[in-house]
Amino acid sequence: MVKLKVRKGDEVIVITGKHKGKKGKILKVFPEDSKVIVAGVNLVKKHTKPNQMSGGGIITKELPIHISNIAHIDPKTGDPTKVAFKCLDDGSKVRVAKKSGEIIGKVGK
């Protein structure tokens, strides 16, 4: 299993495939499959039968895409960037954008 550098809530851009160029936030991460669900990307229409809980109909939902098809958005420039890990002076480990050196987020829960 690969260590993922993406977390829920990260801003990403799709860099390849049918949805190339679309931006969105990560809604859910599937580390065992190396896939993520990005808001507004890879939308499909699903037909549901009526049941006791809902009336049924056609719903639109996002499907997972592979993490190799996305890149983080640099918070400083807005361009796609790779992510590196860096230890700060206080001992905490953070994720930083390689292009600008801007901090993306802390590592851990």
From Swiss-Prot:
InterPro entries: KOW (IPR005824), Rib_uL2_dom2 (IPR014722), Ribosomal_uL24 (IPR003256), Ribosomal_uL24_CS (IPR005825), Ribosomal_uL24_KOW (IPR041988), Translation_prot_SH3-like_sf (IPR008991). Transmembrane segments: none annotated. PROSITE patterns: RIBOSOMAL_L24. The keyword RNA-binding applies. The keyword Transmembrane does not apply. Keywords: Ribonucleoprotein, Ribosomal protein, RNA-binding, rRNA-binding. GO terms for molecular function: rRNA binding; structural constituent of ribosome. GO terms for biological process: translation. It holds the Pfam family ribosomal_L24. One of its GO terms (cellular component) is ribosome. Belongs to the universal ribosomal protein uL24 family. One of two assembly initiator proteins, it binds directly to the 5'-end of the 23S rRNA, where it nucleates assembly of the 50S subunit. Part of the 50S ribosomal subunit. PANTHER family: MITOCHONDRIAL RIBOSOMAL PROTEIN L24 (PTHR12903). NCBIfam families: rplX_bact. This is Large ribosomal subunit protein uL24. The lineage of its organism: Bacteria, Pseudomonadati, Pseudomonadota, Alphaproteobacteria, Rickettsiales.
